Amino acid sequence: MTSSSAPVLPQNILSIQSWVSYGHVGNAAALFPLQRLGFEVWTINTVQFSNHTGYGEWTGSVFPPELVADLLNGIAARGVLPTCAAVLSGYMGSEGTVSAVVEAVRRVREANPAALYCCDPVMGDVGRGVFVRPELPDLIRTQAVPEADIVTPNQFELELLTGRRVTRLQEALDASRMLRGTLREGGPRLVVVTSLVREDAPQGVIETLAVTGEGAWLCRTPLLPLDPPRNGTGDAIAALFLGHYLRTQDAGTALSLSMSALFAVLDLTHRVGTREIQLVAAQDEYTRPSRVFEAERVA
C-alpha cells in the first residue's frame, strides 16, 4: 500500500505596481501570466486608472504611498509573509512609493530571508526619454536597485542607471556587469536587459540579455512592426522572467522561455491588430511555447 504524497502549494509573489481596468500594463500585465505559471500573486496597486496613459487620456486615481504599507500590514496580519518567495515592483511614480516598496521588500525579507526582489526600474525608453519625475532615476538607482536580486532595465534604462552608452554587445555586457555590482550581496545579482537593439546585431531582430556571475546569455527574436509600440511588454517580460526563474533557477532557461512566450504574445497582437497586448489569448504559450527561441551563451 502506497501513501499519497502531500500536495504542493503554489509559491507566492507580492507584486507592487499600477493597475488598469482596461488593457494590460503594470499588475494587469503581470498578474495573469504569473498565475498561469502556477503562482499565487498578492497584488498591491499603486494607481487605479481606466486605461494606460499611452492613449493620452484616462480616468482614475493615484494612491498614496501609505497604502502600500497599510495593505502589507493587512497581509502580514494573516501570518503569510514567511511564505512569500519574491517581490516584484514596476512603475514607481513618486519618492514616497519608492520608499514604500523598499520597506515592503525589507519586511518580506525579515519574514523570509530567501525571498527574491525583482525590480523593473521603469524610468524611460528610447524615443521617449525619461518619462518619470526628474528625481526618480536617482532614487531608484540609490534605494531600490541596491535591494534587488534581479533587475530588468530596458536598454535606455541600463544607460541611465550606469551612465554608459550601449550600442554594441560588449558595451551591453560591461554596463550590465557594472549594474550587477550594485545589486544586493547574497542574491543571484541577475541583470536582464530588455529591448536591446545594437549596431553589431543582425538586422530585423530585438534581443534580451541576461547577465549573472556565472555568465551571460542572449535571446534574439524577430522585431515585429508594431506601430505604435505596445504598452505593457516590459511589465510582462519582468513577470514572465521572474516566474520562469523561480521555476527553473536557471537564467538561460528562464530567458529562453520568457522571451519565447513574449514573442508569441506580440506576434498574435500584431496579427490581430489590437492596441492592447493579447495576454489572455496567448496564455498557452507561457508554459509551452509553440516556437522556442534559444538563449545563446555569449560570455
From Swiss-Prot:
Cofactors (names): Mg(2+)
Binding site for ATP: 120, 157
Oligomer status and interactors: Homodimer.
GO BP term, example: pyridoxal 5'-phosphate salvage
Family named by the database record: Belongs to the pyridoxine kinase family. PdxY subfamily.
Annotated pathway: Cofactor metabolism; pyridoxal 5'-phosphate salvage; pyridoxal 5'-phosphate from pyridoxal: step 1/1
Record-listed substrate binding positions: 18, 235
Gene Ontology MF, one: ATP binding
Enzyme Commission no: 2.7.1.35
Protein name: Pyridoxal kinase PdxY
Role noted for this protein: Pyridoxal kinase involved in the salvage pathway of pyridoxal 5'-phosphate (PLP). Catalyzes the phosphorylation of pyridoxal to PLP.
NCBIfam families: PRK05756.1, pyridox_kin
